[in-house]
UniProtKB/Swiss-Prot annotation:
<keyword id="KW-0479">Metal-binding</keyword>
<feature type="binding site">
    <location>
        <position position="193"/>
    </location>
    <ligand>
        <name>Mg(2+)</name>
    </ligand>
</feature>
<keyword id="KW-0547">Nucleotide-binding</keyword>
<feature type="domain" description="Obg">
    <location>
        <begin position="1"/>
        <end position="159"/>
    </location>
</feature>
<keyword id="KW-0378">Hydrolase</keyword>
<feature type="binding site">
    <location>
        <begin position="166"/>
        <end position="173"/>
    </location>
    <ligand>
        <name>GTP</name>
    </ligand>
</feature>
<feature type="binding site">
    <location>
        <begin position="284"/>
        <end position="287"/>
    </location>
    <ligand>
        <name>GTP</name>
    </ligand>
</feature>
<feature type="binding site">
    <location>
        <position position="173"/>
    </location>
    <ligand>
        <name>Mg(2+)</name>
    </ligand>
</feature>
<feature type="region of interest" description="Disordered">
    <location>
        <begin position="17"/>
        <end position="43"/>
    </location>
</feature>
<dbReference type="InterPro" id="IPR027417">
    <property type="entry name" value="P-loop_NTPase"/>
</dbReference>
<feature type="binding site">
    <location>
        <begin position="191"/>
        <end position="195"/>
    </location>
    <ligand>
        <name>GTP</name>
    </ligand>
</feature>
<dbReference type="InterPro" id="IPR006073">
    <property type="entry name" value="GTP-bd"/>
</dbReference>
<dbReference type="InterPro" id="IPR014100">
    <property type="entry name" value="GTP-bd_Obg/CgtA"/>
</dbReference>
<comment type="function">
    <text>An essential GTPase which binds GTP, GDP and possibly (p)ppGpp with moderate affinity, with high nucleotide exchange rates and a fairly low GTP hydrolysis rate. Plays a role in control of the cell cycle, stress response, ribosome biogenesis and in those bacteria that undergo differentiation, in morphogenesis control.</text>
</comment>
<keyword id="KW-0460">Magnesium</keyword>
<comment type="subunit">
    <text>Monomer.</text>
</comment>
<dbReference type="InterPro" id="IPR006169">
    <property type="entry name" value="GTP1_OBG_dom"/>
</dbReference>
Amino acid sequence: MKFIDEAKITVLAGKGGDGSASFRREKYIPKGGPDGGDGGRGGSVYAVADRNVNTLVEFRYTRIFKAQKGENGRGAQCYGKAGDDLTIRVPVGTVFSDVNSGEVVADLAEDGETVCLAKGGKGGLGNIHFKSSTNRAPRQHTLGEPGEEWELALELKVLADVGLLGMPNAGKSTFIRAVSAARPKVADYPFTTLAPNLGVVRVDSERSFVIADIPGLIEGAAEGAGLGHQFLRHLQRTRLLLHLVDISPRWEAGDPVHEARAIVEELRKYDQALYEKPRWLVLNKLDMVDEGEREAVVAKFVEDYGWNGPVFAISALDGSGCSALTYAVMDYLGMLAPRHEAEDPAPPAS
């Protein structure tokens, strides 16, 4: 299935039913009083977050969602039936925004969370409500109110505790395969990953966290180079970023320090809050460095990069260093307050 993380839809709530203007007419009661019932309310449009829904692809093909209108009132004080509500199911992490104003309408971050997107119109009043001492046979009644109508933009931001950041071919997909059951495509060419991948990293029988791999960034992504920064939104909900850097000795045509800085600069251009998120440095492909030179290579990179935050040297291919990294991540996440209790703390020095 193609991964779709943006869509636009129109939601139309149902119109309320009209009130009835009728009079009681029975045998031996030729001039009975008013007995017109009220119209039923229109159906509303709701959205519910469903963990079994993974993308917004359905909304690329069905763009208009309309709830049922309320039935009109009838004589004998019969009230119209309310219109059926319409519920649409979206992935957990879907954000709804008003297309015209840009205002966020709802952010469904929990499974089962529900929001009313468009409220149904009220039903009209029947003429029974307008009877008075001076008007014994009112013909007045009211029409049902129209339901709300909105044009909404949907944006999916995947929910993960940890996000992977890095250049294409930095080994992010290999890493997520090494530490979780996720099986993203891995190949020796750039942009193998074309959509976000999620993996659950279980460090023991009781503790686990979710990690997200997004397509790699390159310098100029903010201006649309490569795949652009269209997938960076999926890192906004994470609590920690792992910046993977390829330190294998294949840099005749490039400088890993420059490229690492370029990635962080793209992050800053996209979103200052994302740039300030806690970030750890992960130096990957250690298996391609001579064993006797590894410590010196790591130390030189850290010095040249000017990094004084947490740093881990790993090989995603053979798994060395991965266990220590995942345990450190789990311990760090365990020290943070749950998502619903506190915001992320200040990032470590970088």
